[in-house]
Amino acid sequence: MAEGGSLRNRTRFGSRSNEAMNHVDYPDENFVEEIQLNSDTEVMEKPRPIQIVLAHEDDHNFELDETALESILMQDHIRDLNVVVLSVAGAFRKGKSFLLDFMLRFMYSQSSSWIGGNYEPLTGFTWRGGCERETTGIQIWSEVFVVEKPDGSKVAVILMDTQGAFDSQSTIKDCATVFALSTMTSSVQVYNLSQNIQEDDLQHLQLFTEYGRLAMEEIYKKPFQTLMFLIRDWSYPYEHSYGLEGGNKFLEKRLQVKQNQHEELQNVRKHIHSCFTNIGCFLLPHPGLKVATNPYFDGRLVEIDDEFKKELRELVPLLLAPENLVEKEISGSKVTCRDLLEYFKAYIKIYQGEELPHPKSMLQATAEANNMAAVAGAKDTYSRSMEQVCGGDKPYIAPSDLERKHLDLKETCIKQFRSVKKMGGEEFCRRYQEQLEAEIEETYANFLKHNDGKNIFYAARTPATLFAVMFAMYIISGLTGFIGMNSIATICNLIMGLTLLSFCTWAYVKYSGEFRELGTLIDQIAEIIWEQLLKPLSDNLMEDNIRQTVRNSIKAGLTDQVSGRLKTN
């Protein structure tokens, strides 16, 4: 590719009739589209991987580099083209970037020898040998390839590289977010696995795709498009041959739902089938010991086993040949580069917020379920025991006795919770014990209200309060009317009428069960009047009466003593 005012070559792949599903014929140079760029307005940079989703390790959050993404997707010649996004995801240090660089060779090539020369170093997405992660966040290649499909339509092809999952610095949420984002925005997701498809690989796929499906506002049939299982270092060609045919037979067995399978295993497989429109599998051999053990390996084909190169020549065209390209769709509609930019912005906001639940490790999820079950068991014990004390068919019990029973049962239930074997450790379990105590107190408050409702005096508080208000207003109205204070008498009559209307309404609500909110409001107003006015007044009157009674008793006692002494003298 030339820079500045030179011509940019973009590869066009023609299609001819092929005898096998994987066979691809390569075009001659007449199919290469040349795009003239104005050197005065655009300075071409060397194509390179561009970081579009940044990973912040300190707070385990992700940020979209909108400027970088916009500079790629909003170029004049591609922004209104339908987009094809091929993403490679999977565990870290399994060769995702290495594979993508061969895809770049295919996209830039103009001949059937796209795989390159034997002594040509592999360049493109950064990769290296070793055990430490290389890629973080999400990267895309800065060069968007415009390809003409067999039907004559042009599409924009984007290659995406993702942060490897399950490294020592990433949480389950980090892994789920990266995988979900790449799956939601890609039309083909290559799930890069090593040696085999393990059950935990399927479980992680279920978790990650469900995390992506939660973030999508509308689900149109199956939310995602094509999933390609790529099994690297396949060691059993005598059972299933390398390539697509052997891979699909192997995958069919792995994803088969059997009657004798455990329900959990069946659900995993059903979920995966429900998420993707197309699912395939490709078996790729090991690239050779020189690749695995040479610290200076730079991708030269001479050091790669011939069997690997043979299958690689089948795999890459299978994904990227013009007749095999899968255009990105969301909710049944084709997505352009311009649309993809907006979807990226919308999706990253969802994952930056707190609307979605946080994915958890298997240990944490199991520990939570274990502790929640212990909480539920202890709370059930408390509720059943309290039902025996003050349930619906039990008579009213004194509040002091009820509180004493509550405290005894609470202590018993906490002991029951502690006695259950739980995962997570003491600190983890303490949070659930505090949750249990709070829920028991909340349940006790409900039982207390239910018990108060059985108290005939408590049940009669509202009508008694309303009658007291009406009686008081009647007396005050009569007195103020008698002495000529007619305005006050009128106000008292108005209050008395409103109180009478409230009483009739309350009686209707209790009888019919309708307008319960209105009945509750009347009860609350009556309770306020009782607590703030009538109860303090009655307490004062009672205190005065008791004080006067005590005074009279003392006076009578003293009088009797004095009289007795006088008689004695």
Swiss-Prot record:
SUPFAM superfamilies listed in its UniProt record: Interferon-induced guanylate-binding protein 1 (GBP1), C-terminal domain, P-loop containing nucleoside triphosphate hydrolases
Keyword Transmembrane helix in annotation: yes
Keyword field: Coiled coil, Endoplasmic reticulum, GTP-binding, Hydrolase, Magnesium, Membrane, Metal-binding, Nucleotide-binding, Transmembrane, Transmembrane helix
Topology feature Cytoplasmic, residues: 1-464, 509-569
GO molecular function, one term: GTPase-dependent fusogenic activity
InterPro entries in the cross-refs: G_GB1_RHD3_dom, Guanylate-bd/ATL_C, Guanylate-bd_C_sf, Guanylate-bd_N, P-loop_NTPase
GO biological process: endoplasmic reticulum membrane fusion; endoplasmic reticulum organization; endoplasmic reticulum tubular network membrane organization; protein homooligomerization
Listed Pfam families: GBP, GBP_C
Primary location class: endoplasmic reticulum
The keyword Isomerase appears for this protein: no
Residues annotated as binding Mg(2+): S97
Binding of GDP, residues: R93, K94, G95, K96, S97, F98, Q163, R232, D233, V291, N294
Chain segments carrying region Autoinhibitory domain: 535-569
Annotated spans, 3HB (three-helix bundle) domain: 362-453
Annotated EC: 3.6.5.-
UniProt: GTP binding residues: R93, K94, G95, K96, S97, F98, R232, D233, V291
Membrane protein topology class: Multi-pass membrane protein
Linker as annotated region, ranges: 454-462
Region (N-terminal hypervariable region (HVR)): 1-49
Coiled-coil residue windows: 244-272
Assembly mode: Monomeric and homodimeric. The homodimer, transiently formed by two molecules on opposing membranes, is the active form mediating ER membrane fusion.
Domain characteristics, as noted in the entry: The GB1/RHD3-type G domain mediates GTP-binding and hydrolysis as well as homodimerization. The two three-helix bundle (3HB) regions in the homodimer are loosely associated initially, but they tighten upon GTP hydrolysis, facilitating the fusion of membranes.
PANTHER family the record matches: GUANYLATE BINDING PROTEIN
Family from the record: Belongs to the TRAFAC class dynamin-like GTPase superfamily. GB1/RHD3 GTPase family. GB1 subfamily.
Protein name: Atlastin-2
Organism: Xenopus laevis
